[in-house]
Amino acid sequence: MALTFPSPEWTAQLKTVVNNDQAYAQSAKTWEGDFYFIIEPGPGIKQPVKMYLDLWHGKCRKAHIAAGVEDKPPEFTISGTLETYRRVFEKKLDPIQALMTRKLKVQGNMMKIVRSVKPTLDLVNCCSMIPTSYPDQVQA
């Protein structure tokens, strides 16, 4: 059954997939950083949705839809439209290219992400493993 992106269920499933993915565990074994992934308002999204991920040494320590502000701001904030995230998850848009062309906007040390291409691609691969539907495909 497909899970709707973005949703608490999809986010919880991503944590499970990341924590069971050997490729991500290996490529991100030295990665330390947390993120807000913000899905901007648009078709199917009435207000911004903030998904929080805490990635640490190849594992996901926390993953949830953030209702407010975290105790401390995350190291990175990446924001984009639902369609951009969909294209990245469906591997129709390279995530690094999306960052460089500002289809996905980054706050934080972009060079740290650019130097971490393999973990970035493996994280996107984890996202791609989740059977996903989108709010513009179903009534939200």
Q: What is the role of each PLM region?
A:
Residues 1-140:
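Feature captures hydrophobic
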